[in-house]
């Protein structure tokens, strides 16, 4: 299924039904009087967060949603039928904006959450309502009230426990494919991942969490460069970030600074968001070169970076357990592996990871 995280749709609620002009006609009743019923109320337009959806792709094929008009009033004081509602079903995590793309209408963060987008129009009055002491036989009724119409924007922000961030070609998709059962596109060129991906990490017992692969960010992402705003929006809901840095590039410290600057420029709250930093692709360098890259990274990152390889699996489990601990899982029943020591003189890059 293709991933779509933004869509513009047109909505219109149903207009109210017209009131009826009718008079009572019955044998031996010469002056029956008015008995026209009111029109029915038009249908509303709702939006609802449902389970089982993780993309807005359905709105690529249907952009117009219209509720039904209310039924017209009838004689014998019969009110018209109410118009059927229109319900837009979206994934959890969808935000609704006005057409200006700045004014937020609602943020759907829970399954079953519903928001009224456009109420239906009221039904018109039948002539019975216009009867008075000076007008016993009114021939007047009201048309139904027109429904509301508007354009809105839908934006999906994935709800994941942890997010993978980094520059393009940092190995995020490879890590996701090794850590979960997800099958993202993997290739040896930048911007392979064009849409966010999700996978479920299962560490045994009840330790499970959702991991999101965020497409590569570039300098200026906070200002919208390279679809930066759309990608950063998915990071916004993650409780912890795993920052992958390609150790084969010339400046790992610069790569770290670039991503951190863009995150904090987009939202100051990212400064306090838990972060795990890992040097990836250590299988591509000798232990001596890995040590040198680690030294460069520590000039800007004061913590202890992990050493991992998505290809061989080295250090992957360490990173996953570090994420689980930040998420507050109880790991008492899980045999934790010995953490990788980034301060060792000769980091071991030759031992492949095994899930056993």
From Swiss-Prot:
UniProt entry keywords in alphabetical sequence: Cytoplasm, GTP-binding, Hydrolase, Magnesium, Metal-binding, Nucleotide-binding
Location within or outside the cell: Cytoplasm
Stretches for region Disordered: 333-356
Disulfides per UniProt: none
Chief localisation class: cytoplasm
Residue ranges occupied by any OBG-type G domain in the UniProt entry: 160-328
Chain sites annotated for binding Mg(2+): 173, 193
Keyword Iron: no
Domain of life, source organism: Bacteria
One Gene Ontology CC term in the entry: cytoplasm
Domain Obg, chain residue ranges per copy: 1-159
Listed EC numbers: 3.6.5.-
Binding site for GTP: 166-173, 191-195, 213-216, 280-283, 309-311
Cofactor: Mg(2+)
InterPro entries xrefs: G_OBG (IPR031167), GTP-bd (IPR006073), GTP-bd_Obg/CgtA (IPR014100), GTP1-OBG_CS (IPR006074), GTP1_OBG_dom (IPR006169), GTP1_OBG_dom_sf (IPR036726), OBG_GTPase (IPR045086), P-loop_NTPase (IPR027417)
Family matches, as CDD domains: Obg
One Pfam family it belongs to: GTP1_OBG
Self-association and partners: Monomer.
Family of this protein: Belongs to the TRAFAC class OBG-HflX-like GTPase superfamily. OBG GTPase family.
Name of protein: GTPase Obg
Natural source organism: Hyphomonas neptunium (strain ATCC 15444)
